[in-house]
Amino acid sequence: MILDRHITSRGYVCMRPATIAPLTPYDKWDGEKWVTDTEAQHSVAVDAAEAQRQSLIDTAMASISLIQLKLQAGRKLMQAETSRLNTVLDYIDAVTATDTSTAPDVIWPELPEE
């Protein structure tokens, strides 16, 4: 239970349960008020951005899986497939290079259309 100090009309200090709820899941009681632990908040945001990065890369890789299969089988790619492969690889490079330390304000590149 979080306690809040309250001064009575006679000047006595008494402790009572705090009535103000935290604003974020990262708020901690400092004895007088809720204070946001911005380091913890930022750390969680960066972890989420890293997970988002991997999800974007996985989606991009899935979009070229048939092209990869053709290459592994030694088949020649058509010009459109080569172009698509290069475009998606450039996108993956851009996603990989994206700075996640600015989370939650990360600007991700757009996945190229097929």
From Swiss-Prot:
It comes from the Bacteria. Pfam families: Caudo_TAP. Belongs to the tfa family. PANTHER family: PROPHAGE TAIL FIBER ASSEMBLY PROTEIN HOMOLOG TFAE-RELATED (PTHR34413:SF2), PROPHAGE TAIL FIBER ASSEMBLY PROTEIN HOMOLOG TFAE-RELATED-RELATED (PTHR34413). This is Putative protein TfaS. It comes from Escherichia coli (strain K12). The gene is tfaS.
